[in-house]
Amino acid sequence: KKNHSITLMPAIDFLMASVDWTPKDLDRIVVAEGPGSYTGLRIAVATAKTLAHTLNIELVGMSSLLALVPYQQEGLFVPLMDARRNNVYAGFYENAKPVMPEAHLPFERVIELIKGASQVTFVGEVGPFIEQIQEHLPRTNYKETLPNAANLALLAWDTEADSLHDFVPNYLKRVEAEENWLKNHTESGESYIKRL
């Protein structure tokens, strides 16, 4: 059951208590900015922004895909998040630096993009794509991984802080309701989101 809005703050309190920290010990908040679950990203980003604002400390957003990549590893890493219907959110990293923009795309396109690369490792939600990896890229490595917050913290150490008030999640894709709405309102000039 997903109750992040209920369990997130108690989890943060527990983690801080387990290392004998108080909020005053923090000098920066690092948050996975997306892609990912729309609701999960909104909750995480709202919590991170609130903490950073309340404590008057820096906020740094880091890619959720980068959180799937092992820290300080050689070669091309392609983190995947299953986006349903054989689509993925994918990143392309060497030494934790992007070599191509992150994207929401069909998995077949990912295969095309990396076909000539050597020493490629797929990480993240690779399970649904193992057969295709083995068929099209038999010499490619793959490993199911979970996001690693410690890796993000290390990578964010010397990353420039984001503007607290301008920071928004990086969804990489519109929600299905917005895509459907846009199909029916292509020429009206109306905005899907109405300002109050």
Where do the protein language model's features map onto the residues?
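N-terminal beta-alpha supersecondary unit
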Residues: K1-E33
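Surface "functional belts" at beta-alpha junctions
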Residues: N3, E58-P147, E176, I193-K194
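DPxDG-like acidic metal-binding loop motif
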Residues: R28-L59
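Acyltransferase
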Residues: Y142-L196
